[in-house]
Amino acid sequence: MHRHDCFKTPADEDELDDIDDDMVVGVIAEIEQEVLNESESDDDEYDLADMGAPEPERNDGNISSNESISSDGSFDPNAEDTDSDDSMLDEAATAGASIAKRRKEQNAMDGAEPSGSGPSGSGDYSHLDEDDETDETVRAMIAAIKKPRSAPPEIRLEDFITDICFHPERDIIALATIIGDVHLYEYGNEENKLLRSIEVHAKACRDVEFTEDGRSLITCSKDKCVMVTDMETEKLKKLYETAHDDAINKLHVLDERLFATGDDAGTVKLWDFRTKDAIFELKEVEDQITQMLTNEQNKLLLATSADGYLTTFNIGARKLYVQSEPYEEELNCMGIYRGSSKLVVGTSKGRLYTYNWGYFGYHCDMYPGVKSPISLMIPITDRIACVAGEDGNIRACHIAPYRNLGVVGQHNMPIESLDINSSGELLASSSHNNDVRFWNVKYFEDFGDIKYNEKHNAYKDKRHNLPSSKCTNASDFFADMTKEQDDDDNDDGGNNTTAAGSNNVT
């Protein structure tokens, strides 16, 4: 609340014989008390802070109250006696009452609640209008606040999320947890709805996948079991008890009949839903299987491992096809690009190795990538990949030639899993913070192909925030303001030209 603690008085006291300082202070206190009573709000400090000091209406023939109180130079001791002090008090009372009335009407329109105090706990910015603001920065902030959502809100669980998987046909995402449960959420831009929670395994559920028709869930666990569960009835359809001798780390669905599993000791097994036992198994590495992959023909099954090998199995012949030279780093993830002609593998040193399809003995190209380990990779288009890892950032890169396109999204902690929906427009990621975030990546459809000799700034590319990122580039934030300023300048220039032209016309 603003108070006037000291009044400036002229040197000649005869001009204000009828004015008592104590009386003026008393009247001001009465006015402020009336404003407090009229506000009818429990949060008086909030209202008065927003109301500020009363500003009387300016008249051409009178001196404003602010000038008469706080400005020494505006007082003329030789001026004629007037009722300026009395009029000052009257105008202050009128202005204070008017502001309090407008404040009361605004509270009534907003439900008599300050922003953010509603039942939902989130601020209501519907009454904000950027057209009413004169400050360009404030207008830009209001526009950003009122921007409609393009992706679902985040999902947060109490338990650690080990893996996520999108449903192939419906807007449903499955979340596997460290306690062995699977949570099914129906997602949407406005809200996410928990459909059901299924208790599947006794130990950590390490991987979850949907069958191609979306009717069943396949899960593998640290308890060495593989389970096939009906998504609607939550009933167990098939149990592969003790499917491996070691904890199972990864599984991959090949088609409606076949799926593969890999464990912590490097064993890979191929399964048929119609049989009880595995079709075949091979052990060619000594460390954890980190990912498995096939192309559309399903003739070759590729597996990366933590001991630095890329191993390829011939599914039809049920034997080893080829194994790469050993790398002094973990091979964590991979993806197929360029019309199934290129295989790209991400490593624990942040590198990206490229292989020509069918020639998996040694890479044909290497891109340094980022300095942090790459543990996850998702193909977005035939030429664009999203990679993530321990630094908490999801980055997009162009494949052949390699280019960093920018940051798609970010987490506060290392990212654990990554998946994209069937339409290719929505990317989901989970982190060690037990949260799942969604990123709309539809804008990648408009990205053109990059030429080998095209100039670029690698430093800026790594730090550039793409439209889906929660962080905004400073240049993007002020871009609209600069554009509006340029438009205003052009309009002024046009008006000046028109005026000059009219002056030249005789």
UniProtKB/Swiss-Prot annotation:
Region (Disordered): 1-20, 33-87, 100-132, 480-506
Biased composition (Basic and acidic residues): 1-11
Family: Belongs to the WD repeat WDR55 family.
Keyword terms, alphabetized: Repeat, WD repeat
Signal peptide (residue range): none
Compositionally biased tracts (Low complexity): 61-74, 493-506
UniProt-listed PANTHER family: WD REPEAT-CONTAINING PROTEIN 55 (PTHR44019:SF20)
Record protein name field: WD repeat-containing protein 55 homolog
Alphabetized InterPro entries for the sequence: WD40/YVTN_repeat-like_dom_sf, WD40_repeat_CS, WD40_repeat_dom_sf, WD40_rpt, WDR55_POC1
Lineage: Eukaryota, Metazoa, Ecdysozoa, Arthropoda, Hexapoda
Acidic residues composition bias: residue spans: 33-48, 78-87
Ranges for the WD repeats: 156-195, 200-239, 243-281, 284-323, 326-365, 410-449
